[in-house]
């Protein structure tokens, strides 16, 4: 497996993997209208370009045998957040997510953080089990608006 930082020249590829993984993960639980709204507002080329150019955000692709298998977005300011981590379904269960998480752990430690956090949809039981297996502990919640659907994310923190 190979992890590479995403550059602005890979914006279209970032949008493609973002949409594909989000759709695989959440389309069965949300309306087409809400998914379309999310894609148009949160995963547009303009929005992703803004995020890519932000000094507090960075994106990473992960490849399995030269095939793009997922991505991660990190936000680094006063805290270290894993804002997005998505793996294509066909690559789940082979250690891709764990490899990305270990990369995030190493990044946060190298920058002097003693913890990191993330939010996960309360009904994403597979992801919740995965995060708990890595030592994440629930510490709160926040709202997440997907189109017109107000959803609840559980906040998890891992301390080192």
Question: What is each model feature region?
Answer:
Residues 1-3:
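Extreme N-terminal starter segment of soluble prokaryotic enzymes
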Residues 5-11, 15-90, 101-103, 107, ...:
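Acetyl-CoA-dependent GNAT
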Residues 80, 114-128, 132-134, 141-160:
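C-terminal "cap" of GNAT-fold acetyltransferases
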Residues 94, 111-114:
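Short coil/turn segments at alpha/beta junctions that flank glycine-rich nucleotide-binding fingerprints
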């Amino acid at each position: 497996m190979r992890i590479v930082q995403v550059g602005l020249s890979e914006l279209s590829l970032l949008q493609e993997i973002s949409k594909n993984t989000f759709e695989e993960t959440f389309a069965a639980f949300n309306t087409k209208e809400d998914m379309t709204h999310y894609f148009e507002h949160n995963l547009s080329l303009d929005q992703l370009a803004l995020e890519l150019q932000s000094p507090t955000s960075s994106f990473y692709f992960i490849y399995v045998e030269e095939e793009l298998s997922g991505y991660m977005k990190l936000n680094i300011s006063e805290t270290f957040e894993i804002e997005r981590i998505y793996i294509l379904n066909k690559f789940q269960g082979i250690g891709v997510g764990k490899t990305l998480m270990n990369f995030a752990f190493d990044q946060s430690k190298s920058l002097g953080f003693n913890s990191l956090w993330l939010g996960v949809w309360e009904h994403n039981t597979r992801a919740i089990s995965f995060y708990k297996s890595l030592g994440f502990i629930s510490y709160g919640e926040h709202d997440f608006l997907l189109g017109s659907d107000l959803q609840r994310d559980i906040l998890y923190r891992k301390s080192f």
